Regions:
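FAD-site-proximal beta/loop scaffold in flavoenzymes
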Residues: 37-112, 117
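Residue-level structural signal for beta-strand termini and adjacent loop
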Residues: 20, 85, 112, 189-190
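Flexible, glycine-rich terminal cap/loop adjacent to redox cofactors
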Residues: 129-139, 144-242
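Short, surface-exposed charged micro-motifs
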Residues: 16, 62, 76, 174-176
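Short gly/ser/thr-rich secondary-structure transition/capping motifs
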Residues: 23-29, 63-72, 158
């Protein structure tokens, strides 16, 4: 994104936004208390989302909500009222359609007497930008907070044959694996078809696979998925094309 000319100013608090003839002036203060103004053409404000539970009259029937107006549920997605279940954006967790879909399946299985569950560690997140961004599992920051020792495998699309063939080589695949067991703990991708490639790593994590398991799986050539294999090889410094 920086290569595309986008500048990032982290930890800046917006104090005011004023319209002017050519656009807007944004007045900010950073964490050191220094003030800085930015002149811009357009202002896009992204403040997140909240559960759309207003108007459902949940309080009237006694459904319990948390401090953010999300419906409280147990591990089976059951509310405090036995025959009422809740899933998706109105409960705790990422507001993603595929997360809600898996929860819906789990609820149906539980109602049918089966043992439905959702593994939240393997729910991928995708940002549909150019280049595409995808992630799953833990980040390095989270692993450090958990005092989990880990290994990193990283491979650039610059060395991927398919990416070079279509002249789309921006980005990389990064895999995080447990330092002792080699179990895949997370992955982060930036580049072509990242949202598609993340599924392979999700399957690996769902079945407790190691980076070695991915590395020993034959990937067709030339494909973008070879970058995943190479990143897995790179965990033990065995990448072939980097």
């Amino acid at each position: 994104l920086k290569k595309q000319g986008i500048n990032f100013h982290m930890q800046h608090k917006v104090e005011s936004i004023k319209n002017n003839n050519s656009g807007a002036t944004i007045s900010t203060t950073n964490k050191e208390g220094e003030k800085k103004d930015f002149e811009c053409d357009v202002v896009l404000i992204s403040v997140g989302r909240k559960p759309n539970t207003n108007g459902l009259n949940l309080e009237k029937i006694g459904i319990k909500l948390d401090e953010r107006k999300r419906i409280k549920t147990n591990k089976s997605f059951q509310t405090n009222i036995d025959n009422i279940y809740a899933i998706g954006d109105v409960i705790v967790g990422p507001m993603l359609a595929h997360k809600a879909e898996d929860e819906g399946i789990a609820v149906a299985e539980n109602i049918a007497g089966q043992s439905g569950h959702v593994n939240y560690d393997t729910i991928p997140g995708v940002i549909y930008t150019t280049p595409e961004v995808a992630s799953i599992g833990k980040t390095e920051e989270q692993l450090k907070e958990l005092n989990t020792k880990y290994k990193i495998g990283k491979f650039s699309f610059m060395a991927n044959s398919r990416a070079k063939a279509i002249d789309d080589t921006e980005g990389f695949v990064k895999i995080l694996a447990d330092e002792k067991t080699d179990k895949v703990l997370g992955a982060h991708l930036i580049g072509p078809h990242a949202g598609e490639l993340i599924a392979e790593i999700g399957i690996a994590m769902e079945f407790g696979a190691s980076s070695e398991d991915i590395a020993r799986t034959c990937h067709a050539h030339p494909t973008f998925s070879e970058a995943v294999k190479e990143a897995a090889l790179s965990v033990d410094k065995r990448a072939i094309h980097s």
